[in-house]
A protein has these predicted regions:
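TPR/TPR-like alpha-solenoid signature
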Residues: 16, 20-23, 61, 68, ...
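Residue signature of alpha-solenoid helical repeat architecture, marking inter-repeat boundaries
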Residues: 16, 61, 66-68, 88, ...
Length: 509
């Protein structure tokens, strides 16, 4: 980085020229994954993440370029910073620059800024908004260059994130010629990497080997381009994804080797979010190896890291992995809580495909789900995944449907879920301790009364308490149980005067 700064001579530049040159260099360093370099180059204009750049004395058009650049950098750097509000800051800066470009009628710059804004929304999991913005940008970005390629890649990433793999594949393959002729090695690498990710998700039992081999070939092309771009962070992404493919091929030892190298690279870059992603993959490999304790520990740590960042889609993914590990360890309640958190996190940011996968996985992994929760989970999963083009997901949905039918047949009754909003049955809700204690108390007493055929005397004996204490609890705290006990029969004076054996003494109030 010192070499870069030493070569950066600004003595012959005006303030406006220097600002534009710093922005240009910062974006080049971004493509290399050089966080420190970016901040060093931008320092005179931008002091720190979350702060507004200093545009004093700059021409309005140059100030807009600075705002756009800092917005792009903030969006990018937030992938390794523990700042939940980073994306909001990025959106505000980019939007401000966009408004300036609109005011001077520069439609190309408006489209470019809108494309970068779309990336911010994608990072937050707002897939519908991101898709719309990318599509609107591409209408204006007609020139075959890096800017159009970046917008096309963003659209493909959104479709992949939404599990619309065939659409993502078409977007990438239809524009292969453009990505072949662009000058950015970083963009070329990202193109081949995304194509590999799509091919992997479109693998079916009949084409699995072919698709996975094609994916590995694309990853090799991606690694080559990222090496030319001198970007170790993106190379780590490639190695993480190759590790995932090796897991699918049951080559676990090789998978761990790739993942260790990926984690080393992200560690050098101090990119905590990407490190958590790699730990998610490591946990999945451990699960495949049936090393569930190791998987749970690694996934739990990844959840802890992502909870502190704004990467909700990534958090939802890792929560699902953590839920699987907990379920395999027979910790059903903790597993259900993890799955329900994944559903809630994904649902809140509009990543409905991820919410659907979480609900589907909960059905698959937990045998003791209530009929209501099971039905609600399937109802939501089937709706949220209705546009998915993954053959694997369709097979899993069919298996889940059979499980729901079997549960209904066994229980002999239909689930009592409100049709208008079945999601409530599968979300974690705040717990009122006093209410829950009363509910549990009522359940225990009801069972005792049922076993005692409504006899308060015998129920009290079963519960190791006095008749008077049980009667008081029912009358004061559990009035709904009054109908469960035998009717109170008052004794006449004659009956009271004649001693009787305990078996002959009727229930008293």
């Amino acid at each position: 980085m010192k070499i870069t700064l030493r070569k950066f001579d600004t003595s012959h530049l005006t303030a406006n020229e220097e600002a534009l040159r710093r922005c240009e260099m910062a974006l080049e360093l971004k493509d290399r994954g050089d966080y420190a370099g970016v901040q060093g180059v931008m320092h005179p204009l931008w002091d720190a993440m979350g702060e507004r750049p200093n545009c004093t004395g700059l021409h309005a058009s140059v100030a807009a370029e600075v705002l756009l650049t800092v917005g792009i950098l903030t969006c990018w750097i937030s992938t390794q910073c523990q700042l939940k509000k980073a994306q909001e800051t990025a959106k505000n800066l980019i939007t401000e620059s966009l408004h300036f470009f609109e005011s001077i009628g520069d439609l190309k710059k408006v489209a470019a800024a809108r494309s970068e804004l779309a990336y911010c929304y994608w990072c937050e999991g707002e897939l519908n908004e991101a898709r719309t913005m990318f599509e609107e940008s591409l209408v204006k970005l007609t020139t075959e260059g890096n800017t159009r390629a970046r917008a096309l890649l963003g659209l493909a990433v959104v479709e992949w994130s939404a599990s619309r793999y065939a659409i993502a594949l078409k977007c990438l393959t239809d524009n292969a010629a453009l990505f072949n002729k662009i000058t950015s090695y970083a963009l070329k690498g990202a193109y081949h990497s995304q194509l590999a990710m799509v091919l992997r998700m479109l693998a079916t039992p009949s084409n699995k080997n072919d698709n996975l081999q094609r994916a590995v070939a694309e990853y090799q092309k991606a690694d080559h381009n990222f090496k030319l771009a001198r970007n170790p962070v993106f190379r780590a992404d490639v190695k993480n994804n190759v590790g995932n493919i090796l897991r699918q091929l049951s080559r676990y030892k090789e998978a761990h080797k790739y993942l260790q190298e990926a984690k080393r690279l992200t560690g050098l870059a101090k990119d905590k979010a990407r490190t958590a992603q790699i730990d998610d993959t490591r946990a999945q490999v451990f699960i495949a190896e049936k090393k569930f304790k190791e998987a749970e520990a690694v996934a739990r740590n990844a959840v802890r890291i992502l909870e502190k960042s704004g990467h909700q889609c990534l958090l939802a993914d890792v929560l699902v992995t953590h839920g699987i590990a907990l379920a395999r360890l027979k910790r059903a309640e903790s597993a259900q809580f993890a799955f329900q958190r994944a559903i809630e996190v994904a649902h809140q940011v509009g990543a409905l495909n991820k919410a659907g996968i979480a609900a589907l996985t909960m059905i698959e992994e937990l045998e003791e789900l209530s009929s209501d929760a099971l039905y609600a989970a399937y109802d939501r999963a089937s709706e949220w995944l209705t546009t998915s083009q993954s053959q694997d997901l369709l097979i899993r949905l069919n298996a889940a449907a059979r499980k729901v039918v079997a549960k209904v047949r066994t229980s002999g009754s239909l689930p009592q879920v409100v049709a208008e909003d079945p999601i409530d049955a599968i979300l974690n809700k705040p717990c009122d301790l006093q209410r829950e204690v009363l509910k549990y108390e009522g359940t225990v007493i009801q069972r005792a009364l049922a076993k005692a055929n409504g006899s308060l005397t015998r129920a009290a004996a079963m519960l190791s308490m006095s008749y008077q204490a049980l009667a008081y609890i029912i009358e004061s705290r559990q009035p709904d149980l009054l109908k469960e006990r035998t009717p109170i029969r008052r004794r006449s004076r004659r009956e009271s005067a004649v001693p009787k054996s305990p078996e002959q003494i009727p229930e008293q109030s």
